[in-house]
């Protein structure tokens, strides 16, 4: 059974910054396109709310297999987020105020009937790097701190460590 084509929106980083060969958002967009659906890219500055509706200047994409020239962009379309089959929040950190404001707009879109994946409140309230604290039985020795002395002592104790910012990519 063939279903009618649907429109999927992806809120993400600027397209030229995405590395198609390793970016999971690109893989998701390609999977959507392979199934005959339409893909739209939305950058954070393109999100807005007006007169009771969360909207965006959404850019339609044609996706290509070539990882270096992986998309062609059409002219931006002004669209209500609730009119998409799904809105995927795929923006990478930094977790700054623009990110927070984007989650507020996406939450408003949910209230208007949009289907937003990566729930705005959840990604705002639940830090992905600190989430491991809920699964202590499955983690290596872990330290979360901003204190350089504690980090040094932790490395001395364990020999090496992976150090990542809570609010950035890495």
Regions found by a protein language model. Give the residues of each.
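Active-site nucleotide/adenylate-binding loops and adjacent lid/helix of ATP-dependent enzymes
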Residues: 2-3, 7-34, 39-170
